[in-house]
Every structure is written in C-alpha cells, then in structure tokens.
Amino acid sequence: MAKQDWMVVGITCMVIALSGASRVCAGEQGQPTVGQAYPALASGVLKKAVLVEMDPGTLLTSEGLEIKASRITEAVEAADPGVKEELEKNRFFLLEQETVKALLLEEAASSGADQQGLSEREVIQAHLDRKFRDIQVSDEEAKAFYDANKETVGGLAFEQVKEPVKEVLARQKRQGSVASYLQGLGRNREIRVNRDWVQAQHAPAMDNLVDRARRSGKPTMVEFGAEGCVPCDMMQPILDRLRKKYPDELNVVFVHVGENRILGARYGIRSIPVQVFYDENGDELFRHVGFYAEPEVLKQLAKLGVE
C-alpha cells in the first residue's frame, strides 16, 4: 500500500492530539488556564488546567493525582538518545502524556476488567481495545478513499487494494475514536499545574519550525512527512513551487517527522503526509491527510488570502 501509516512515537502510552479536558475555567478560579496564558503550548488534556503557585518539586495535582518534577526528569533521562534533546525542550508535553496515562489507568481500573499480570501499558492498550474493537470500514468508505487517492496506489484497480485500504482506514478510524474518547478525560475534575514551571517551559517548547512560523504574522502551510513515503515525495515539488510563487506572502514549512518526533506528536500527526494551514494569527484553519493535489492546495491558500 503506497499510503504510509506512520505512528510518530510513544513516550508514555500514546501520542495523540487531544482537545478538551477539565471544566475548570479562569472565571471559577480567578486564575488563568494553560490554554488562556499559553495558547499554543498544550495539545489537549491540560489546556484547561489552572495555573497556580506550587512547591517547585510538584508539577500537577488533581483529586488524588500528583505528578512530581522528578517523574518528568526520569522520563527524559530514560528516553531514547534520538529524542532526548527534543524532549528536553518539551517537558510540558511529557507532563501532558503522564497525565493522560494516569487518567487512562483510572478509567481502566473503574471498568472492572481483570488487570492481573499486566503492565501499565498493557492495561491501557487492553482498555482501549475493548472500547474500540468493533470499528469497521465499509466497501463504500474504502471506494471513496480510493477515488480520492488514486495517485498513491500506482494505478492499481480498486479490488486489488481494497483490503489494505480498509485496514488503513479502520486504523485511522480507531485512532479518531480514541482521540474523541480522550477529549473527555479529566472533564469533570479540577486539574492544577505549577504556574512558574509552565512559564519556564513555554519558550523552549515554542523554539521549533512550526511555532516560529505561526508567530511570524504570515499565513503558513506546514507539511508533516518523511523521505521515502510515496505521497510525501509527491508533495515536495508542490512545496517547492509554492516557495517560489509566494516568497513573501506565505511560510511553507516541511517537518520530517522522523527527525522531529516530539513535534509531530505535539501536532497530532498519526499518518503522513499531513498538510496543515494556519492564518496570519497562527490559528489552524484546515488540515488534510494524504497526498493533496496542487489545485486543492491553492484553494486553501486563497481562503488565507494568498493568491
């Protein structure tokens, strides 16, 4: 199958873009949330966490849950050398992942399923498998995908690629369902994070290709991909033409997810290629998965005022 499904990285349990979390808001607490103070920092479960003063050794508290700074430091030190440098700049991301892990373990325990002899990772995986094992893809859905992505299957007939297409779509469907489920984690609980620590993490986390472009004041198109991925390689000439056509009007950014695994995880990249379009304020307006034909790209750019 030419379209490559590429899992970016598992730091603690999974790397999935999250959105939504605690219902705590600044109006209730009189203190800002992470999402209000640092809009681009949190990718999900901590967006609505309240920033409060804490002991330097404590990073997060919430109804029986406490995460210490030492836990994040240990995770960085134990990381693969290939991602350790990137993790040093993304400790807040690790805190989010540790929070997701803890909340998922709570959910799994409350389900009453037998966990004897299982590792934490196995408990989480079994819990998610039980919840989303019945997801299927119809022939009609597979055909619609095939019709929209004929360029990536090398001219093969639908019947020749139907089953691989259905496997990829089912995997993506499960990932989407998991993401929706994760949106509800922590929704009914108060989550508090260390104000000073989060402030210190903001600058290093924003020091990357994507966030710098989003803060430039110009519209931005980001391509998340990798070399050797057929649809990714097909996108490169399009990106080159865009750079030449709009040198002053548009940021065109390519992120190699193999070399920027944490950045890809932060931006919820589960399959490649992915094209994400941001307006001049850095707000995401649209994203697309798979090869994206140049006429369609130009339509999205026109919506951003780039013509």
Question: What is the predicted role of each segment?
Answer:
Residues G268-V276:
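Structural micro-motif
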Residues F224, R243, D248-R261:
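Thiol-based oxidoreductase modules, predominantly thioredoxin-like and allied folds used
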Residues M1-K89, A148, I191, D207, ...:
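Short, low-structural-confidence N-terminal segments
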Residues A26-L51, T152-S216:
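A C-terminal, polar beta->alpha supersecondary segment
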